[in-house]
Amino acid sequence: MRITTLSLLLSAPLVANAAPFDTCPSKAYLFQSTPVQVWGVNLVTGSTTLLEDDTGMNANINGVGFDFQDRYIYGYDTTNKRLVRLGQDFQAEVINTSGLPTDHTFYVGDVYDHVYYLYRTGKGLFTVDLSPLDTDPNATVTVNKIAGSPATVKLTDFAFHPSDGSLYGIDNNSGGLYSFNPTTGAETYIGDTGETGTFGAGYFDVNGYYYVSRNQDGKIYRINLSTDNATNIAAGIVPAVEFVSNGPASGQNDGARCANAPVVDEDSNIDFGDAPDSYLTLLASNGPRHELDGITWLGTTPPDADLDGYVTPQSDETVGVDDEWANGGIGFVTALEAGLDSKVVIEASTTGYLSAWIDWNQDGSFDGANEQVFTDYALDAGENDLFLNVDINALTGTTWARFRFSQQTNLSYFGGSTSGEVVDIQVDVLNDGATARYFPSASGYATLAYEDNWPYKADYDMNDAVLMYRITEILKDGKVVKSTIDGRLAAVGASYRNGFAVRLPNLDPSLVSSGNSYMKHNGVFTDLDLEDGRSEAIFVIANDLTEKISTGCTFYRTSNGCKEDEQFSFQIGITLAGDGVSTGSWTDMPYDPFIFATPGYYHGENLPLHPGRSWEVHLPDQAPTEAFDTTNLFEAGLGVDDSNPSTGKYFKTAENHPWALIVTSDDEWEWPLEYVDIVTAYPEFKEYAESGGDTNQTWYQSPADNQRYEP
């Protein structure tokens, strides 16, 4: 008899009756891995906190649900095929059951009205009345299968709607949203969510929004199943909108949450925006929000927390800390004028990434062309001097801007972030008739190609420096007020070291407003290298193009057997002083882009040792700069160069073969392979050059086979 009693005690352990949760918490709970780990998930921002990595069981717990009535989490131990519950200490207690199937496990479950529901595709919908546990935690509860429940939908989780009492889940294969009758198990197709995958965790909030977490990438999607959206639901319009992009990914996911709680606590630790809701500001609109990390903010004062966005005429500046205006950390030094650059000072509390949008067309959204003005720009702690380009078609008037600063990248103007701050402000824009003109077009690039063996032809492959090149000029009242030069380094097929610069012929450097001009390398602001001591404005993009690349090939992007991505881009924003320069006094595009010898390096036989800036190669018939050594290079009669300053002939042979080319075509030009003469790669080029450009003007459209680099 004693042996029998001991056997019964071992097979049915006594429940310690851990304390339930004190409240209906807003946090979502995510159960992952074996042995199970319990994570707290902020559904608003996507941040996660490990709450417990030892539940007292070396097992996986799945099919979890929160019981609002007794405030326990119930789940299914997939390792040992038994039911468990967890209180606020997250220690799992085994529940005594009868009728629990032993031929399969459960991964789908939730609790509603004190009944635990379990589901398995192909097996059915099961119920467990939990009320016996109210008076005796060691009571045995009965597992019942709902007769006739079809269980055909492939689910990995479902959740109860807090208002209508139905279960909802997404078919992993089709992305279809289904509702389930908890009494009969009947399945009703509602509509296509537009997303597929293993949705291992599902949660509702008190407003009727359904949140699902996808195991593969951790993204959290939200579906509007609120009563206010009844018309769309009835019509099957139930898209799953990406709500958080950085949730926790796992092969074993299940979630539980008190569906009667809002997703934002009254003691919120989240910053929201302030613009009108047409810009997607409120949480219901998936507006921008940042979990306050105590480290990352704009301005001098940390932001305060909000329960939701403050939509105009309300404003966050009237509640708590004025972190949107006086302390917002955003200062426009120059006005926002259409087509021009505006200097803006951004004060950051620490390093991080800035993205920003301005509604140029004033249509109440930030999704227009050119409305994202900064993308993942890396800020330093303290003041950062930046420039943004005002869209040429921006409308005059007051509009909205949104700045987001975070430790995350790839943020949009909506959605959650686990760190930082969002600042929405109104800005004034002026458009007083500025117009733009382009070279070669608004979106295309010309190709610059250089041979650096001048004054010798050598291999004449015209790929020692290849750059893509574009210019945008802004004009007002018959004057050029701004020029922007964009470029990309496409190839370096040189053994010699070369720099690259652009001269604006006849433009006195004093006419450049240096404080309002800038240079970027790979999207990052760097020093504006306007050469000192010159009579004309010369901007040095790079003293050594080779330093701008890292290649595993013999040369960079000149062999089809060794292809690499582009690595270096640049932009020069040149603002002219005063009212600008009259178009009659302004030089024609494409200006004068040229290469020069990198200072301190050898550049070929019979040349001065380490010629540096005294050696240049320009486009044909373009005179060199004042830095060029005319005496030792032109007048010495070196190589095959036939330059003659008295006749205006520069950088061409006696047959008119140049050492530099600029090609404008609908498609970006493909330059010759390494050691392939351009005449071999493009046979019609010879007659084009020797005719002075009169014949074969489309020579670049007729390449020989297998003789050019094909990106």
Where are these regions (language model features)?
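Repeated scaffold domains used in trafficking and secretory/extracellular systems
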Residues: 19-20, 58-66, 100-113, 150-159, ...
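An edge-strand/N-cap motif at the start of beta-rich repeat modules
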Residues: 19-49, 272
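Conserved beta-propeller blade signature
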Residues: 23-32, 72-75, 115-119, 166-169, ...
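A broad "non-catalytic interaction surface" signal
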Residues: 262-463
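A eukaryote-biased signal for long
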Residues: 535-711
